[in-house]
Amino acid sequence: MKNLYQLLFCVFAFTLLIVGCKKDRDNSPGSYIKHGDVVYELSQGILENYGKYGTSEANNLDVILLSPGFKIHESNGQIDSISGMGNGIHFEIHDSSFDKLDIDDYIYNNESEQLGTFNHSSAVFNYDSRSENPQEFEISSGKLTVKMNGSEYELSFDCLDSDGKIISGVYKGSLKYYNYDDALKSAGIKNWPDIR
């Protein structure tokens, strides 16, 4: 009888463990940015082509990943502004393509605009487009990995901010594409923090 109670207790404990783990998995977002110990959901992505700068062989592509509280406003098919509140991350990537990201690992290098690098990147938390006074953290090192799953991107990043705090995350989904030629170098989200 004692063995039966122990067996039932073990089965009950194991069931609770499995249900608890499944619940934890269900509550974590599929796309997120993590700063220190705090996790923020990401739900939308933008890919902006700024073409080539100077003598660099690489195209300048900006990737902006945003939380669900933001709405992008367009004018004549180009980004005009952003409204709402939330969090996001921006990568300035040097790539061989102009309309998509290469499947590759991009390494942070603030001194270079070589293929396969990124620089001038930052994460923004608690941004309110009405007050434009976010908590902004410049990225000082790290890696961004780009993969494809069918027609959707899988971006993962593991970086440090200028204070040495970890900024990491994953984004799974599409990136809305905007093409800015030489005449539109100043285009993009006008009221988004810019560290360039």
Locations of the language-model features?
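N-terminal targeting signals for Sec/Tat export/insertion, comprising classic cleavable signal peptides
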Residues: Y40-G54
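A mature extracytoplasmic/lumenal domain signature
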Residues: I46, D95-S97, I107, G150, ...
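Surface-exposed helix/loop patches within compact recognition domains
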Residues: K52-K147
